[in-house]
Amino acid sequence: MSRFSGALQLTDIDDFITPAQECIKPIPINKKNSKSGAKISVQEDGYYEESGTGKQKLQKLEITLQDCLACSGCITSAEGVLITQQSQEELLKVLHENKKLKAEEDNNLSRTVVFSVATQPLISLAYRYKISVEETARHLAGYFRSLGADYVLSTKVADDLALLECRNEFLEKYRENNDLTMFSSSCPGWVCYAEKTHGNFILPHIATTRSPQQIMGVLVKQYLGKKLNLPASRIYHVTVMPCYDKKLEASREDFFSEVNASRDVDCVITSVEVEQMLLEVDQTLPAQEPADLDWPWWDERPELMVYSHESTYSGGYAEHVFRFAARELFNDARPIQLQIDQPRNRDLKEFFLEKDGIVLLRFAIANGFKNIQNLVQKLKRGKGSKFHFVEIMACPSGCINGGAQVRPISGQHVRELTQKLEELYTKLPRSQPDNIGTKKLYDDFFDGFGTDKSHNLLHTSYHSVDKLIPALNIKW
């Protein structure tokens, strides 16, 4: 069974394969002219050998994860590669080797290891081990330090920056064309589906603001690296996320720096993988020695380290952007209430700003592939313009119910588990992205707000993938 979101499991024909079985990616072959025929035989050790006038071992065909992401065929075929490149086994191997390097004298090969932990995994693990979310963060920090982490961070600052960038991007697009529907961009399952299925039709509607994971990558590799006087290649950055799709996002070529020869995020592990790591050594999270999370961003350390954002469970994009736009565009700072348009569909919420019977702003939150598909089809039929902004997440109930959150216990329904996690989320203090710290970060590192540097580092681009259906994809 695939671990990725529903949006990543849909393709034209029979997509659930792995590269080792039948990859449909067309690979160019450099042909050499031959005066005589040749035979290709398979040797005992599995390699192919061409024999004509002589014998020659043929080059092994390799298909990378980047090939999979750039291919219009199967998406889940990348899963086999991710298992080895983005797994807890690979993480533990890297940490073990790094510990040995640090023990050597005059060593310049070891790396500084940084973990960045999102809020949703903390909630999932807190519920599993029946401890508070703050306690979970401290025990997790202690556990990661025991494995070899040098820094353990929350993603709060990246969450804040993502909201600030997204709201200003919406304002710019609205002023250019107030009929344009803008979609959020933090869900990699949704972005990958849009690139591969709808291409250039839908991509101009997607916000270019990077997800918090990738903003965190910039902050760790460049800002923190500068403070530590370390090149990006000497930092190993691990994120803890609620869904497997984040592994795909971290592997995008857009988030690899040729200058620094480094990815913004080197490895992604998930809530359920953390649980598995503990189970494999017969341990529990509360048994780990607690430690404080690190705060390297500015001098004023927050009293608490784990925060929620607005009233939704996936970053709060729709509500935050709505409040900001209502105030900036229409001088309206009234509190809003989420109006559920379809009571039986809790994954589709709509809310609006109305004045004198005229709807000035209409926003929506759409979770789950069914709602995504319906919205895209409405947009194609010219009916999607009634929404100015849509917060989209591929998983039903959003990131709190990510595909890699800790599984329900025996006999527990997924819906019940999700409700418990939502209750924990709503009890968290709410972050205020407009604060002295984020302003200082913009001034010190991004050369100010709205600068070329901030745009280059906090925004990304998307790529339409042309559909190629070669003969190898046909099942007879």
Curated annotation (Swiss-Prot):
GO terms for biological process: iron-sulfur cluster assembly. [4Fe-4S] cluster 2 binds at residues 187, 243, 395, 399. It holds the Pfam family Fe_hyd_SSU. The keyword Nucleotide-binding does not apply. SUPFAM superfamilies: Fe-only hydrogenase. [4Fe-4S] cluster 1 binds at residues 23, 68, 71, 74. The keyword Nucleotide-binding does not apply. Gene3D superfamilies: 3.40.50.1780, Fe-only Hydrogenase (Larger Subunit), Chain L, domain 3. Signal peptide: none annotated. One of its GO terms (molecular function) is 4 iron, 4 sulfur cluster binding. It comes from the Eukaryota. Keywords: 4Fe-4S, Iron, Iron-sulfur, Metal-binding. Belongs to the NARF family. Component of the cytosolic iron-sulfur (Fe/S) protein assembly machinery. Required for maturation of extramitochondrial Fe/S proteins. PANTHER family: NITRATE, FORMATE, IRON DEHYDROGENASE. This is Probable cytosolic Fe-S cluster assembly factor GF22738. It comes from Drosophila ananassae (Fruit fly). The lineage of its organism: Eukaryota, Metazoa, Ecdysozoa, Arthropoda, Hexapoda.
